[in-house]
Amino acid sequence: MARRRPTAHVAHPAQNALFAMTDLPTPAAPRRLFTALFPPPEACAAIDAERQRWPGLPRRLHPVPERMHLTLQFFNAVDAPHERDWLAALQTLRFATFEITLTQAELWRAPSGVIAVLVPEHTPELAALHRATAQLARQAGLPAASNGFKPHLTTLRHAERTTLAPLTEPIRWTVRQVDLIWSDLKAQPPQYRRLGQFGRRAP
């Protein structure tokens, strides 16, 4: 019988449709996992409003607002033992809340094509959180890099014909936890499944 993990924090109600959830059996095959920072709904709405202003948008806008995030670590195939160790390591994560401010829109060339991203101000708090989560991933036996971190939030895929405009104003949100996400590409439609939320200080 498959072993079950302890139940993680409950997902935000506004995201339930996209983040099915948590008490899932131990996987038989490696899974596509990443840690990330998700903006709250009001910040997602502001990001979506900004991209709606850009000329040359594709017919369908991906990602949808609820799936927008800033990735900390990403691994394409994590087996069950490493996943369990990563979950255990992330349980020890603690950090003070801090603010992310998205200030600039840029076009980047990715393996899947041109994407539009929003880039945040560089802050010591975000850099420290990336280092801390990378160290926890390495403790779990995963090859996380500490250097070369380029924080960004992907706002639009298939942006080859899109012309960006400066943001009307910076977009801010307060970071309170780190999410561990399983990107389930086999689901129809593909889903993000939240495996846990980490880093909240005790009240």
Model-assigned labels for residue ranges:
Residues 2-203:
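Histidine-dependent nucleotide/RNA phosphoesterase domain, centered on the 2H-phosphoesterase fold
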